[in-house]
Amino acid sequence: NDRLFASATIMRSLWAGETVSTAAPVRTVEARLHTRPTQPPLLLGAALTPATAEWLGGWADGLITVATPKGDHAKVAGAFRHGGGEGKPMYLKVDLSYARTDEEARSGAWDQWRANVYPAAVLENLRTPGEFEALEDLAGPRMVFEKIRISADPKDHVRWLRTDIDLGFTHLYLHNVNRNQETFIEDFGNEVLPEIFG
């Protein structure tokens, strides 16, 4: 967290036109932007846990997190607001598997997403494709189905996304994890998004 906050402070100083030299925890020597943006970009903080989100609320310009079928992202959003993020934008990445049948949605999720069910602490230590494949063999379908929203019913997705909006998420990024992107785009464009945004 110290490195993250120090990096954010350095970026903000650079965007303000300052020359920055720091020793620790991030070293910079007379860093300077020769061309600055007219408007500094938002500095979003990424959080998967309420503790990190609460810490980010006090200094980040916004939050980005990942939706979970169990609704853990509601706790993350609440902690961000509690920590000082009230009124700041919140971005949500929604991993989902949509197809026209539940079986296709489940099999697409299993086929494409089973390597992504492990925590970052495990994944960041894998070095070869073989290590990823070995890990995939240990994943069961239930592990995948607990990590993403899976349904062939557009009404389920409408309900879930409305809940996300009610939680205060201002930007939703929908990621259909299976390969059937054409059906996803067509059906969400015709049946899901109009229900949410009119």
Where are these regions (language model features)?
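Active-site-adjacent structural elements that line small-molecule/cofactor binding pockets in enzymes
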Residues: 1-198
